[in-house]
Each structure stands twice: as C-alpha cells, then as structure tokens.
Amino acid sequence: EYLAKKQGCFHIIGAKTLHNLKEFYICEGFATAATIYKALNKLVIMGVDAGNLSKIVETLKNKFENTPITLIADNDKKRELKGLSNVGVETAKEIQQRFSDIKVIIPKISDQEAGQGVSDFNDIFLNKGLDEVKKQLNFIDFHNKLNTFENPTKTISQKDITR
C-alpha cells in the first residue's frame, strides 16, 4: 500500500503544464509513459497504476472537457491465460464506457509473449524495438479513427484488429 496520496495524482512527460495542449495520452507506469513519449514525441501522462486512471480521466475531462484523450492500456494477458482478470484491458474498457469519447489503445501481445511477461508498450520496446511500438500505435490508432468514422457508436476491440 502507498504511504503517500496517489488517487488522482500523475506525472507528466514531455511538457511542464497541461494547458494549451491539443490531446492527452495516458498510461499506467513510468517506463510505458517514457516509451510512448519516445515513440510519439507527444506529452504522456503517467497514472501510476490501473486503479488510478479513472480518477485522472475524470479530472482531465472536468478541467479540459474538449481536449481529446487516448488511454494506452496495459495488456495483462498473462493473468488472463491463468484464468484471472486482465486488469489493464478491463480497466480501460470500463473507463471508455464511462467516458465514451476517449480512445483506447491496447498493445497486441501473443500468448507466447504474455508467458514471457510482456504486458505493455515498454515491454514491446525492450523485446522488439521502438519501430514495433510505433507500428502498433499507428496501426491501432488508424483503425480506431476508421472505425469511428464508419460507425461512431461501436468500440473497437483487440479482437477486431487483424494484420
């Protein structure tokens, strides 16, 4: 358990303030945030863990209601393969149900990679390099935009994306 206040707190990578920004990218951990910043060269908000993301999104929506938000989830597939909940994906989907205008990006991870402990974009960076991270981010974001254009009420899921 944390000794300091965590709920609603976050760290920003790539900017000193949130004012005047055109979009927000939010993820769980620092290493993932640093990887996303390196891949996109855009501000990334590190939310500490999945349990804190909803409060951060709520705070940002209240203060910057017209600024688009993209939530970059962890894919805890290893837990799922053991019959447990995929906390990263489930949390992201719950947040997206509550705030339907946010986009969610979930890293594509094979069962074999999950078994080796790969669960987020930093793990993908360490195993496959920055080009794979960029490729996945661009591919998934493109399909999200295409899907929104074709059917604005449908949420794209990991299963909808094929290569």
Name every feature range the model reports, one short phrase each.
Residues 24-26:
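Conserved beta-strand elements of the Class I
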Residues 21-22, 35-163:
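TOPRIM fold recognition
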Residues 1-21:
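Glycine-/acidic-rich phosphate or pyrophosphate-binding loops and their flanking alpha/beta elements
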Residues 32:
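Catalytic-loop motifs flanking and including active-site residues across diverse enzymes
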